[in-house]
Amino acid sequence: MRSHLVKGADRIELTIRSYTDRTGRTPKKKVLLQMHRYIEKDDKWTNKDIPCKSEAEALMKMREVNQYWIAFHGYTVEES
């Protein structure tokens, strides 16, 4: 699932990723909420991975992040 927020040329992309971590003895399902943010004045992308326990938790965090950026920073949801 993805979410795109925009404010002028600045943008935030949120993506929920799930994968199986096979590095240990037993495979474990991992879920991440990935935030990619582009700032025009710096002309660079920043990335942040937020670990979650489940896809439902990742979806709740995605909604919280969306509400924060919309309410406090004036971003709007990009229509696809």
Predicted regions and their residues:
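Short, mixed-charge low-complexity intrinsically disordered segments
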Residues: 9-16, 47, 67-80
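Short glycine-enriched loop/turn motifs at secondary-structure junctions
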Residues: 40-46
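Short N-terminal "domain-start" leader segments
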Residues: 1-35, 39, 76
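Generic detection of short hydrophobic beta-strand segments and adjacent strand-loop junctions
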Residues: 4-6, 48-52
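A short, charged, amphipathic alpha-helix used as a generic interaction element across diverse proteins
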Residues: 44, 52-73
